[in-house]
Amino acid sequence: MASMMSNAAVVGRTTPAQASMVAPFTGLKSVSAFPVTKKSNDITSIASNGGRVQCMQVWPPLGKKKFETLSYLPPLSEESLMKEVQYLLNNGWVPCLEFEPTHGFVYREHGNTPGYYDGRYWTMWKLPMFGCTDPSQVVAELEEAKKAYPEAFTRIIGFDNVRQVQCISFIAYKPASYDA
């Protein structure tokens, strides 16, 4: 048992530099140094936004499904659509079209937790348009998709192939049968 014990003595020494690293406690500050404001317990002193509440409206949740980025705006004109696609191209994103023939919005079919089959993933129209530099090419593909699937929702996404993320997504076409 004596062979297991060490004869080396451990000495813990503090240096003067360690003691001066933390400022010593000097006590609490005087209360007289702080301004004192008396708070009223009267309920009428609480700020009211009653004037603003009167002009607020609640978005009706039934019959007014909304989709993605530009869904609260009226349908895009062809000129506005071209500008959005040009913005996408100016940022170096790859345009891609996707369509959904039955549900143009997120829904829960196979449970109440988010999953693969809940409307987030749409069918890709052809391949991503790598190397596309002209918005009219994207709009021409959109027209082709509308002819092939006139009752499908179609969206344009902008994909950043460097960061491997989708940067923009908006509905470019809603079927005529959908009334919002």
From Swiss-Prot:
Which residues constitute the organelle targeting sequence? 1-54
Name what induces it. The least expressed of the 6 small subunit genes.
The UniProt GO MF terms for this protein read:
ribulose-bisphosphate carboxylase activity
What keywords does the record list, in alphabetical order?
Calvin cycle, Carbon dioxide fixation, Chloroplast, Photorespiration, Photosynthesis, Plastid, Transit peptide
Q: Which domain of life is it from?
A: Eukaryota
Q: Which CDD domains match?
A: RuBisCO_small
Q: Does this UniProt record's set of keywords contain Endoplasmic reticulum?
A: no
Kindly give the SUPFAM superfamilies that the UniProt entry links to this protein: RuBisCO, small subunit
* Subcellular locations according to the entry: Plastid, Chloroplast
The terms describing its cellular component in GO are: chloroplast
Under InterPro entries, the record lists: RuBisCO_ssu, RuBisCO_ssu_dom, RuBisCO_ssu_N, RuBisCO_ssu_sf
BP term (GO), one:
photorespiration
Q: Give the family from UniProt.
A: Belongs to the RuBisCO small chain family.
Which PANTHER family does this UniProt record tie to the protein?
RIBULOSE BISPHOSPHATE CARBOXYLASE SMALL CHAIN 1, CHLOROPLASTIC, RIBULOSE BISPHOSPHATE CARBOXYLASE SMALL SUBUNIT 1A, CHLOROPLASTIC-RELATED
Quote additional remarks: The basic functional RuBisCO is composed of a large chain homodimer in a 'head-to-tail' conformation. In form I RuBisCO this homodimer is arranged in a barrel-like tetramer with the small subunits forming a tetrameric 'cap' on each end of the 'barrel'.
Oligomer status and interactors: Heterohexadecamer of 8 large and 8 small subunits.
Function, please? RuBisCO catalyzes two reactions: the carboxylation of D-ribulose 1,5-bisphosphate, the primary event in carbon dioxide fixation, as well as the oxidative fragmentation of the pentose substrate. Both reactions occur simultaneously and in competition at the same active site. Although the small subunit is not catalytic it is essential for maximal activity.
Instruction: Please report the name of this protein according to its UniProt entry.
Output: Ribulose bisphosphate carboxylase small subunit, chloroplastic 2
Per the UniProt record, the lineage of the source organism begins with: Eukaryota, Viridiplantae, Streptophyta, Embryophyta, Tracheophyta
